[in-house]
Regions:
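Conserved PLP-enzyme active-site core in the AAT-like
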Residues: 1-115
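Non-catalytic terminal extensions of PLP-dependent enzymes
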Residues: 99-227
Length: 227
């Protein structure tokens, strides 16, 4: 939903030729939860697309409520108005600063534009902060060497830094940033991730099991790579 508001974002699906697009405006625009927009490129197939507006309207009428929330609809309109009035430059500057900082992490890895062209990746939304834990290891003394998972990173960020991620997977976490995020909030995210990364790096783990100046249970054995 935010792509059209600045050139730093990828082209929107509509700009790339999609006939029907659903945008969850509550994700990245200042709109209430549950709000979304349905975009239809044209009214009939003979107008140059595969969408049939009459059929779509018929199916919507089968499932939609007869008592829509005017609060939610007003929220959508207000969010669009706000975005039209917002200068994206300060947010873009803060976002690029955060990404440069996270790009310097030694073991946690930020998904960046270097991935474009690989494995079918055509573009990248820089407002999504995707951090990979692949290749990092924990060394809790009671459990031995274990892989550091996305779920563990997500838990640490929530429990120790009071930062809620959008989602996590087996070996990554995803944070969503928006124009409504403050510079202070983005800096807090950068502080948390770089600190966790430094704990993985500076643990002083030794292969014989004797840890020298171990600083954290999230310690990484730097001579081990997880595939």
């Amino acid at each position: 939903a935010h792509f059209r508001y600045d050139a730093m974002f990828p082209a929107s699906a509509l700009d790339l030729g999609a006939d029907v697009v659903i945008q969850s405006v509550h994700k990245t625009l200042p709109s209430l939860t549950q709000t979304a927009l349905l975009h239809i490129k044209c009214n009939r197939p003979d107008e140059g697309c595969y969408a049939d507006r009459e059929r779509i309207d018929r199916y919507i009428h089968m499932v939609q409520s007869s008592s829509p929330s005017y609060v939610l609809m007003a929220s959508i309109e207000n969010s669009i108005y706000q975005m039209e009035q917002t200068d994206m430059a300060p947010y873009g500057k803060q976002l690029h600063k955060l990404r440069r900082r996270l790009g310097q992490m030694r073991h946690l890895r930020l998904a960046d534009t270097g991935l474009i062209g690989q494995a079918g990746i055509r573009d990248l939304d820089i407002s999504k902060i995707v951090v990979s834990t692949r290749g990092t290891c924990l060394y809790p003394a009671e459990d031995g060497l274990t892989g550091f998972t996305g779920a563990q990173l997500d838990d640490i960020l929530r429990r120790e830094y009071h930062l809620e991620m959008e989602m996590c997977g087996a070996d990554y976490v995803t944070a969503i940033t928006t124009v409504m995020d403050s510079g202070e909030g983005l800096e807090r995210l950068g502080d948390a991730l770089t600190r966790i990364d430094s704990q993985l790096t500076d643990a002083g783990y030794k292969p014989d099991g004797r840890s020298g100046n171990q600083k954290s249970v999230y310690s990484m054995r730097c001579d081990t790579a997880m595939s």
